[in-house]
């Protein structure tokens, strides 16, 4: 299993028509974004005074992420992307 560092997040992209709260996203929005599930998160980032700021997302969250963000990686037969937390646009609440 992949364990990201810092503010990075491992995502599994959902390969289906994107919906947010039951609404199907318009074609142009689907081209600019992807829906994904958070598989793992890094520990967060340190502030200048050394405090640790934890990630805003947690394992299991469904998120909307920029379509071209991140690095494609493979772990066994599974495909994932690793993104910085700043590339996650929203948490999808069901």
Curated annotation (Swiss-Prot):
GO terms assigned for molecular function: ATP binding; identical protein binding; metal ion binding; protein folding chaperone; protein-folding chaperone binding; unfolded protein binding
Keyword field: Chaperone, Cytoplasm
SMART domains reported for this sequence: Cpn10
One BP annotation, GO: chaperone cofactor-dependent protein refolding
GO cellular component, one term: cytoplasm
Cell compartment(s), UniProt: Cytoplasm
Predominant localisation class: cytoplasm
Matching Gene3D superfamilies: GroES chaperonin
One Pfam family of this chain: Cpn10
Similarity annotation: Belongs to the GroES chaperonin family.
Subunit record text: Heptamer of 7 subunits arranged in a ring. Interacts with the chaperonin GroEL.
Record's function text: Together with the chaperonin GroEL, plays an essential role in assisting protein folding. The GroEL-GroES system forms a nano-cage that allows encapsulation of the non-native substrate proteins and provides a physical environment optimized to promote and accelerate protein folding. GroES binds to the apical surface of the GroEL ring, thereby capping the opening of the GroEL channel.
Protein name, as recorded: Co-chaperonin GroES
Species per Swiss-Prot/TrEMBL record: Streptococcus pneumoniae serotype 4 (strain ATCC BAA-334 / TIGR4)
Gene this chain is encoded by: groES
